[in-house]
């Protein structure tokens, strides 16, 4: 649960408002460790999960009907800071006008960014996790085919990291 601070322009006083959400509450009722970090501008819950608890939380959300991994991506908090893996889940059904959504964030140490793969829960994670591996160097443990997907196989480094130094020259091997 997060406290969001708002300040009234009229009197200059600060009010503290507690942020909760039904998805976070359901995870809490199951005893699954997580932290609700807030809501985005569309009131979608953003939940922080430690890597060792990701699979348990992901399975619980899948069991609760979050059957679609709309997006998975890696991100970099900045040079010297942590890397992360983000999962945007949707509960799709035939009659849903505005289906529930949730965003999970997992923060990883820069020097050893490892997190379990959710491929075995949502198959749409396949190429998305491969892209995060290719661009950020995040290792998705248990992924069936974790190889580069965009960069040449012999590329050195992780091009989307904020501390990446672009090489002055790279020679492509001729396929013929």
UniProtKB/Swiss-Prot annotation:
Highest taxon in the source lineage: Bacteria
Record's keyword terms, sorted: Cell inner membrane, Cell membrane, Membrane, NAD, NADP, Plastoquinone, Quinone, Translocase, Transport
GO biological process: photosynthesis, light reaction
Disulfide bridge partners, by residue number: none
Catalysis performed (reactions): a plastoquinone + NADH + (n+1) H(+)(in) = a plastoquinol + NAD(+) + n H(+)(out); a plastoquinone + NADPH + (n+1) H(+)(in) = a plastoquinol + NADP(+) + n H(+)(out)
Hydrolase in keyword set: no
Keyword Cell membrane: yes
A molecular function (GO) term: quinone binding
Record EC number: 7.1.1.-
UniProt topology in membrane: Peripheral membrane protein
The protein's role, per its UniProt record: NDH-1 shuttles electrons from an unknown electron donor, via FMN and iron-sulfur (Fe-S) centers, to quinones in the respiratory and/or the photosynthetic chain. The immediate electron acceptor for the enzyme in this species is believed to be plastoquinone. Couples the redox reaction to proton translocation, and thus conserves the redox energy in a proton gradient. Cyanobacterial NDH-1 also plays a role in inorganic carbon-concentration.
Family assignment from sequence similarity: Belongs to the complex I 30 kDa subunit family.
Subunit record text: NDH-1 can be composed of about 15 different subunits; different subcomplexes with different compositions have been identified which probably have different functions.
UniProt-recorded name of the protein: NAD(P)H-quinone oxidoreductase subunit J
Gene expressing this chain: ndhJ
């Amino acid at each position: 649960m997060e406290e969001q601070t708002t300040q009234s322009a009229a009197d200059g006083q600060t009010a503290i408002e507690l942020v909760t959400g039904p998805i976070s509450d359901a995870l809490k009722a199951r005893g699954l460790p997580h932290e609700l970090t807030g809501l985005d501008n569309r009131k979608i819950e953003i939940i922080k999960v430690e890597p060792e608890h990701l699979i348990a939380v992901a399975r619980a959300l899948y069991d609760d009907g979050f059957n679609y991994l709309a997006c998975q991506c890696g991100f970099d908090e900045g040079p010297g800071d942590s890397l992360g893996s983000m999962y945007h889940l949707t509960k799709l059904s035939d009659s849903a006008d505005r289906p529930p959504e949730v965003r999970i964030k997992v923060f990883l140490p820069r020097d050893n960014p490892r997190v379990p793969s959710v491929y075995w829960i949502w198959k749409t994670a396949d190429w998305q996790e491969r892209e995060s591996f290719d661009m950020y160097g995040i290792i998705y443990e248990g992924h069936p085919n974790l190889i580069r997907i965009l960069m040449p196989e012999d590329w050195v480094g992780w091009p989307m990291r904020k501390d990446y130094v672009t090489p002055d020259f790279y020679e492509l091997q001729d396929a013929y």
